[in-house]
Curated annotation (Swiss-Prot):
Homodimer. One of its GO terms (biological process) is pyridoxine biosynthetic process. It is found in: Cytoplasm. Binds 1 pyridoxal phosphate per subunit. GO terms for molecular function: O-phospho-L-serine:2-oxoglutarate aminotransferase activity; pyridoxal phosphate binding. The keyword Cell inner membrane does not apply. Pfam families: Aminotran_5 (PF00266). Keywords: Amino-acid biosynthesis, Aminotransferase, Cytoplasm, Pyridoxal phosphate, Pyridoxine biosynthesis, Serine biosynthesis, Transferase. Catalyzes the reversible conversion of 3-phosphohydroxypyruvate to phosphoserine and of 3-hydroxy-2-oxo-4-phosphonooxybutanoate to phosphohydroxythreonine. This is Phosphoserine aminotransferase.
Length: 363
């Protein structure tokens, strides 16, 4: 039984909070979308009513990212993990390899999945620093054999983030941006492929998207499972089969919300303010500590520990009672994690820091 009659602050890593404004629009349109007498989730993906939704979603995303016509967008049913299989199949011929900078669980999963199809060259491994830092990568770090470089730009579990996107010129840069896409300004031309699960900054779970430079489509010559084939999905405008229609609709609303705020430039300033507020407090505290190197601290996932682990359960229990949900760290690392994606308002972080101060004062 839930104790709260109003919305709480969800700091979970994902599925994450959605903007209240988006939820209100979705609720208002749920039973009768644009006078159709149907919910969006009931509309056929072949009807013009939904085709307008997916077309508008792509237009809005292109506007947010200043995306040129030399890149294509495709929406997929399923999370970012499916791209761990899709990428080598789409980008590599048999016998070729790719490079990976290993900075956490998600690069390890991409590496392991890639080995089912091709060789993988690990050009950086942050295991020895316990995944508390990320590398500064240039062409000089490349293996010389790989056809692309795979990175995870923000690591949700360990709370690390590339402060600057690597400038790789010799081969395409492929980035898993699941937990940070649309949170800060990027130059898409720095990438060959960007992919992301939706459940952090884009929309509900069960949806992912890929942004693919057009010259990388159809280059492998391999037999690719149809729903993993980037060329097929692009050619069919993500409508080869029934897509995650309602998730795409929510993503469209999120894109509209973000543009209304002022776009990525505006939300980046808010995200920097939120991250600074919580990191500054942690660094000044005698109870809390952040294990991540300062240069590599994520602005999306703030990882921290209590110096007295005996207080962990008490901290979580009291946080929940105060409407601060999902602060437990990942099961592999423990501790705590505050995920402060785009939809987390500044007031949520202010309330969290106030609670943390109050909790410390009572110890």
């Amino acid at each position: 039984m839930y104790l709260f009659q109003e919305r709480i602050y969800n700091f979970g890593a994902g599925p994450a909070m959605l903007p209240n404004e988006v939820m209100e629009i979705a609720a208002a349109e749920f039973l009768n979308y644009k006078g159709s007498g149907m919910s969006v989730m009931e509309v056929s993906h072949r009807e013009p009513l939904f085709e307008d939704v997916i077309t508008e979603a792509e237009i809005l995303l292109r506007k947010l990212l200043n995306l040129g016509e030399d890149y294509s967008i495709a929406f997929f049913s399923g999370g970012a993990t499916l791209h761990f299989s899709a990428l080598p199949l789409n980008l590599l011929k048999e016998g070729e390899s790719f490079d990976v900078a290993h900075t956490g669980i998600w690069t390890k999963k991409a590496w392991e999945e890639g080995l089912k199809f091709n060789e993988v060259n690990v050009i950086y491994d942050s295991t020895n620093n316990h995944f508390t830092d990320v590398p500064v990568l240039t062409d000089s770090n490349l293996s010389g054999k790989g056809k692309y470089l795979h990175i995870t730009s923000n690591n949700t579990i360990y709370g690390t983030q590339y402060p600057e996107i690597p400038k790789i010129k010799q081969i395409p840069l492929v980035a898993d941006m699941t937990s940070e896409l649309l949170s800060r300004k990027i130059d898409v031309k720095d990438f060959g492929v960007i992919f992301a699960g939706a459940q952090k900054n884009i929309g509900p779970s069960g949806l992912s998207l890929a942004i693919i430079r057009n010259d990388l489509l159809g280059i492998s010559g391999r037999k690719i499972p149809i729903l993993l084939d980037y060329s097929v999905m692009v050619k069919n405008r993500s409508l080869y089969n029934t897509p995650s229609t309602y998730s795409i609709y929510i993503a469209k609303l999120v894109f509209e919300w973000l543009l209304k705020l002022g776009g990525i430039e505006a939300i980046e300033k808010v995200n920097e303010q939120k991250a600074k507020l919580i990191y500054d407090f942690i660094d000044s505290s005698s109870l809390y500590v952040c294990p991540v190197q300062k240069r590599a601290r994520s602005k999306m996932n703030v990882v921290f520990l209590l110096k007295d682990k005996n207080l962990d359960s008490k901290f979580l229990d009291e946080a929940e009672k105060n409407g601060l949900h999902g602060l437990g760290g990942h099961r592999l690392v423990g501790g705590f994690r505050a995920s402060i994606y785009n939809s987390m308002p500044l007031t949520g972080v202010q309330k969290l820091v106030s609670f943390m101060k109050d909790f410390e004062s009572k110890i």
